[in-house]
Amino acid sequence: GDVYKRQVSNKNYGVLWDSYSLCRFGDPRDYSQLGDVFKLYDKEGKEGALTGTYIPGKKDVETLVRREDSLYFEHLDRAAHLSKVVNLPAEFPFGGSDVVYEGEIEPAESGLFRFILYYAGYMKVYIDNELVVPERWRTAWNPNSYKFAVNLEAGKRVPLKIEWKPDAGISYCGLRALSPVADEEQNKLSWWGEMQNEIDYYFVYGDDMDDVISGYRTLTGKSQIMPKWAMGYWQSREKYNTREEVLSTLKEFRERQIPIDNIVIDWLHWEQDSWGSHEFDPERFPDPKGMVDSIHAMNGRLMISVWPKFYATTDHFKEFDEKGWMYQQAIRDSIKDWVGPGYLGSFYDAYDADARKLFWKQMQDHYYPLGIDAWWMDASEPNIRDCTDLQYRKDLCGPTALGPSAKFFNAYALMNAEAIYDGQRGVEPDKRVFLLTRSGFAGLQRYSTATWSGDIATRWEDMKAQISAGLNFAVSGIPYWTMDIGGFCVENRYVAGQMEFNKTGRENADYKEWRELNTRWYQFGAFCPLFRAHGQYPYREVWNIAPAGHPCYNSIVYYTKLRYNMMPYIYSLAGMTYFNDYTIMRPLVMDFTADANVNNIGDQFMFGSALMVAPVYEYGARSREVYFPASCGWYDFYSGKYVDGGQKLTVDAPYERIPLYVCEGAIVPYGPDMQYSDEKPASEITLYVYTGKDGAFTLYEDEGVNYNYEKGQYATIPFAYNDAEGTLVIGDRTGDFPGMLKERTFNVVKVSKDQPQPFDLKAKGTTVKYA
């Protein structure tokens, strides 16, 4: 489902559309079936439909050919238990098959036609004999959509061809279209909400885009400072199946001296038939309190997956149900899930304030006494049944305590997050909350909640899409975003490559690509607000991806260590998100608004005010184009060499390095090597000053784990560089907090055009004793 809609302009204004229902913006029309937009012709030239050819993967099954007057195979049949897709030939075995839809389309008008492709498995689209959608893939149970546009002429018939490899017995396919809009409408923005009492929106104006986002947070709530350990590395997978797997993984990180703060236990840590019991399976996870204590003894933190879902046989379901706080449609329709034989259950109504209190109480009674540190709120759309048509989705998650589900369709994640945030702060007011949720809504930041981008695929195009996705999420006003590094859903070829390597020790072509994909994704992930790896098999621990000494291993470890060196910088940015309404992951347009060349750049970004990151997202690429915004010069992070701004260059991108540049005037504090975020006090800081322009930065520090910063218990140290004089002023400390360092040393390293200096914690600089 769509999240709330917020539009931000580089003209320094934003619009917040205040609606909880399903919304659209831009062109508010819904996509239509192909036959409603075009005349269709099959491959024989007969009007009224395309030709669908279903070529089985089994020799004893005949090829099926039929006319298709629409391509709308996007949903499970409501009456079938995960076994039939609406409109597809039920008798055809899709596993291993090839499907081709072909013919011609004829528009009644000329202009830009927009299409939305719905796909699972492998898919390509050709229009007018040109490949308009290169191969895309998504695992069959988790379809995706992709939008594209093509110019067509009125009355001109053009060939259309879709090649589809379903990749499983149940799979999905769809292609719908929008007719052109008039030229004068192209640049107009429209908003549409399915159900609301009135048209309601906020117009927010500011001096710059940061000021606009500050206005949004004035309306919807401050962004809390996450626990400091949340800024460290997160190791996850689907899934650690035993207590031993969890503890041995964390132990391996420590023995290899690879920094880590957080490890994650995913779904199904309970007994198979006990979803929602909040009890660990005693056979696989004996003594869960002892397990958590062992994690803490290794200076780690634990996040656990908690769904708003309950099997009907659990006591927790019954407790909700007897109070009328459980959605009933799935129970009435006997909807069973995908686990084992399939179990009956549903989700609780998070729109009821008392139901939210009960949801937390059940967690408090079972999980919280174990010492669990963070909460992973999965499926918070809520996703009661996969691949379900929109109307039935609304039926399944309503009615709510506040009214029809259609009216409150998109706010469930916000309500669910409120349950945990208010619940934990009610029990331990000073312990920082951390939540991770799959969906979001306006105001989520006030509940110390981060959002990740869901079950994305292990594809290069999916990795590229994450760059712009993260940036768009950031300018929506919610600063903490993350993704499944490496992608969640894995192509079978990568699984086969891993298994062949396990058996023979040979790195085949697919496994070689798998390693490079993960390398590039980790490089990118190290510069996101949260640094988190997760996904299905193959396992995502660095030593399971590649052995020590391999370029993949070396690179992942390098950037993990660099992340911890950057902790003084990153945590200062976190402080700014609260006190200054700052945004950590920044599209270039936020900092270089006067440079029109940055307006449409979605594959580079600023990490804070200093670092420009240019991820590599093409297999085998050892260089990429980078645009260097005007108004300042740039320094190569690794060599210190200077580059003039206002130009596009092809830069080196060797396997082990991501292109990374620092702008003139930047002041960046780096801390010592660490194995976890609070291993050492930052008593020695290497302070890099990139000369050429005046610059400033403020170091922010607090206790890192509590809410004393809300009471004024924190400290800041300002740095100001005057380029004309070549002087750096380290200002007086402001503020105080328990445990604060009273004395420290700064090693000030200047980088200039004439004296390039690579990043090196041992670089010779000017030592400043500070007290």
Question: What is each stretch, according to the model?
Answer:
Residues Y118-A120, E163-K165, R733:
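Beta-strand-rich extracellular modules
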Residues I55, F113-L117, K156-E163, G726-L728:
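Short, well-structured beta-strand segments within conserved domains
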Residues L660-T767:
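Accessory, solvent-exposed terminal regions and/or long lumenal/extracellular loops of proteins
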Residues G1-A49, P56-E68, Y72-D98, Y122, ...:
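Catalytic-domain carbohydrate-binding cleft regions of carbohydrate-active enzymes
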Residues Y101, L611-P615, G726-T734:
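Short, well-ordered beta-strand segments enriched in hydrophobic/aromatic residues
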Residues S110, G155-R157, E743:
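Extracellular Ig-like/FN3 beta-sandwich strand-entry sites
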Residues K124-D128, R622-S639, G739-D754:
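Beta-strand-rich binding/interaction modules
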Residues I105-V125, L160:
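Aromatic-lined ligand-binding clefts that engage carbohydrates, nucleic acids, or primary amines
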